Each structure stands twice: as structure tokens, then as C-alpha cells.
Swiss-Prot record:
Protein's name according to its UniProt entry: Aminomethyltransferase, mitochondrial
Domain of life: Eukaryota
Residues reported to bind substrate: E232, R261, Y399
Keyword annotations of the record: Aminotransferase, Mitochondrion, Transferase, Transit peptide
Lineage: Eukaryota, Metazoa, Chordata, Craniata, Vertebrata
Length: 403
């Protein structure tokens, strides 16, 4: 879910999510990178470690990026996402605090229900995307991006201090847990063997605390960043390796890294913060208007509401769209042109789709060019290639609902 751009020569892939150290061995100077509790586990299993958002994480393992991607779509893969910021918001004013920062209707969440939401600024720009869960234990569980760690923490802590100065009992705790994502059509079948809870009763975007393969105190949330069914497991750091090893004993499960995670999320039409959305992009421009709670729209009481609601009611100048493209792989920053050859926009993410066997991308174009089926051009290495505005997700998502 983040950020600078780097080429991985041996993968033939450019990952918008990864910073400039990607694809190079970590030097001694880079040893200051933070390590997840699974660092040694990754090395023992052939993980190729790269720098990402201040952390050392595996970009892939012994399997190729494409093999890992397809295994996730057909079976399930285990991802280490422990670099994500996990926080608890406690106190009677926890909902008030969160709703002062995000666009979603947090008050309407049922116990253990979560939602994707957005931190916004007064100009309507997106400061980060995050998942907020209203737990039955009486706190909000928040997961946000590693690349926005300091910014997000400062934002929430600032609001905590503001409310505390007014006599509120609200407080914030950073959750020092590992976070494992088990993703794919057989993920919950694998997990069910290690839990007493009936996972059929845990639909998409709901959460529960349970014992997982003998590890107590795990929060299991049915969500992910691949478009597949699956879970994210917040597990006490000291037990992370034990849990990962237990999951990996099932032949359905393989380890996967950042490379597969990026192409999976792009096929699913999911945004990468810092590339597809940023502080200068509004939810309407980013095609994320669905994150705006109905009550919040009416009250206009979130940061940037006047700008965002005006765009909802009027006409927005640009929109995020999906593109399917001919020719060479399309990368971020590639110009988008109309059929007359005039530059009208920019690609923000792109890769060859392992499932579709063609190039897919996201980018921003003027609203009049955003209708699916609109023919356009993209420029790759100074050559123009055909592209068509396409509906997202590019690959059908398989979220588990009870409907």
C-alpha cells in the first residue's frame, strides 16, 4: 500500500510500492531498517529482502513472482504485513475522535464490524487509507499504512491531546503485534483447522479475537489486499513465527512477498497510497466516493467536506480509471493521450496481469474520457500504444459475504 517507484530487473516488474533500495542487496548501512518478528523466518525460507517504507521485507521467495501470484488466486499464500501501523483508540470519545479525522460512518459500525476509510485534509485530499474496526472489547482497532506511520500517528495523537485537554478519557495505544495475511480461495479452509470458531460466521470486514493453532490473543479480520477471500491475523509478536510455521505446514499454503502483493492488488483494482491516491487526490477523483458515510455526507463534518461534497454534487475534473493496454508493459508516470495525440493524463500504477495475460493499469483522465470502453493511447518509451478504459476490478473479486 505504498510508495516510491523502483525497478526489479530480475522480475521484469516495476513496483510502485517499493523505494529505491528495491532489487539491491541490503548493505550494512541499510541494516538500520526495521525488522518484523518474521525476519529470520523469511531468510530461512529463501526470502529476497528489500527495503520498503523503512522496513526489511521479502519481495519474493524461491518461487517466481508470477508463480506466487497465481498460487494465491488458486490456493492461498501467506504474507507478512507486520510493517503496517496497528493502533487501538480507547475511551468514550473514541468514535468522536475517529470521525473528526475520517470520512466514514464509524458510529454505525456493529460490534466487530470494520470499514475501509480515509484520512482527509481540509483541501479534501487523502492523507491515508485505513481500516477501522469497532471491537466488542470496547475500542477501535485501526490498521494503516507503514509509509504513513509517523504522519498517521501524529494525526491521531494530536486529536487525542486535543480531546484530553477538553476532559475526554480518550487514549491511543500502538499495538506491538505481528500481522499475517492469509489470502486465497482456500485460506479459511486452512485456518479453520486451527480455530474453534466457525469461520462461516465471519463475513468480509468482520473481526474476532480467537486462539489460532494454539496461539491465544489473535485478532482475525476477514479482509485483505488481493481481491481474494482471506484474513489478516494480528498475532502477539513472540508467537508470530510459530503461527506462520503452523500455517505453512498445510501444502495449500506458500509464502508470498511484495511483488505478488502488488500485482494482486492491481488486478483487484485496489489503490496504492502514494501512487494511485495521495494528499492531492480527493475521494471523488479517486473513485472512492463509496467510502463516504451517508450520515457524514449530510452532516459535512469531516475534513475537506466542503470540497468533497461540492465535487459529489457537481462535476469533478478528473477521475481514476482502469486501463487495459496493448504492447509493452505500462508503468507509473506514463503519459495518457487522447486519440488525437494530446496528453490528457498520467498512469499511476501498471503491470502485466498474470491472470489476464495482458497489461493493466490505473491512471487519471478528465471525466469526459472516463467512460468504460473509451479508446485512448499510452506512451511507453516514446512509443504510443492503444489502451481502453476498463471497469475495475480487472479480475473478479471473491470476498466472502453472507448475502
Amino acid at each position: 500500500m505504498q510508495r516510491a517507484m523502483t525497478v526489479v530487473p530480475h522480475l521484469g516488474l516495476r513496483l510502485q510500492a517499493l523505494p529505491l533500495a528495491l532489487g539491491r542487496p541490503l548493505s550494512r548501512a541499510q541494516d538500520v531498517l526495521r525488522r518484523t518478528p518474521l525476519y529470520d523466518f523469511h531468510l530461512a525460507h529463501g526470502g529476497k529482502m528489500v527495503a520498503f517504507a523503512g522496513w526489511s521485507l521479502p519481495v519474493q521467495y524461491r518461487d517466481s513472482h508470477v508463480d506466487s501470484h497465481l498460487h494465491t488466486r488458486r490456493h492461498c499464500s501467506l504474507f507478512d504485513v507486520s510493517h503496517m501501523l496497528q493502533t487501538k483508540i480507547l475511551g468514550c470519545d473514541r468514535v468522536k475522535l475517529m470521525e473528526s479525522l475520517v470520512v466514514g460512518d464509524i458510529a454505525e459500525l456493529r460490534p466487530n464490524q470494520g470499514t475501509l476509510s480515509l484520512f482527509t485534509n481540509e483541501a479534501g485530499g487523502i492523507e491515508d487509507d485505513l481500516i477501522v474496526t469497532s471491537t466488542s472489547e470496547g475500542y477501535l482497532y485501526v490498521v494503516s499504512n507503514a509509509g504513513c506511520w509517523d504522519k498517521d500517528l501524529a494525526l491521531m495523537q494530536g486529536k487525542v491531546r486535543e480531546l484530553q485537554n477538553m476532559g475526554s478519557d480518550v487514549s491511543l495505544e500502538v499495538v506491538d503485534n505481528a500481522l499475517l495475511a492469509l489470502q486465497g480461495p482456500t485460506a479459511t479452509q486452512v485456518l479453520q483447522a486451527g480455530v474453534a470458531d466457525d469461520l462461516r460466521k465471519l463475513p468480509f470486514m468482520t473481526s474476532a479475537v480467537m486462539e489460532v493453532f494454539g496461539v491465544s490473543g489473535c485478532r482475525v479480520t476477514r479482509c485483505g489486499y488481493t481481491g481474494e477471500d482471506g484474513v489478516e491475523i494480528s498475532v502477539p509478536a513472540a508467537a508470530a513465527v510459530r503461527l506462520a510455521a503452523a500455517l505453512l505446514e498445510n501444502p495449500e499454503v506458500k509464502l508470498a512477498g511484495l511483488a505478488a502483493r502488488d500485482s494482486l492488488r492491481l488486478e483487484a483494482g485496489l489503490c496504492l497510497y502514494g501512487s494511485d491516491i495521495d494528499e492531492h487526490t480527493t475521494p471523488v477523483e479517486g473513485s472512492l466516493s463509496w467510502t463516504l458515510g451517508k450520515r457524514r455526507r449530510a452532516a459535512m463534518d469531516f475534513p475537506g467536506a466542503s470540497v468533497i461534497i461540492a465535487q459529489l454534487k457537481g462535476k469533478v475534473q478528473r477521475r481514476r480509471v482502469g486501463l487495459t493496454c496493448e504492447g509493452a508493459p505500462v508503468r507509473a508516470h506514463s503519459p495518457i493521450l487522447n486519440m488525437e495525440g494530446t496528453v490528457i493524463g498520467t498512469v499511476t500504477s501498471g503491470c502485466p496481469s498474470p491472470c489476464l495475460k495482458k497489461n493493466v493499469a490505473m491512471g487519471y483522465v478528465p471525466s469526459e474520457y472516463s467512460r468504460p470502453g473509451t479508446p485512448l493511447l499510452v506512451e511507453v518509451r516514446r512509443k504510443q500504444q492503444m489502451a481502453v478504459v476498463s471497469k475495475m476490478p480487472f479480475v473478479t473479486t471473491n470476498y466472502y459475504t453472507l448475502k
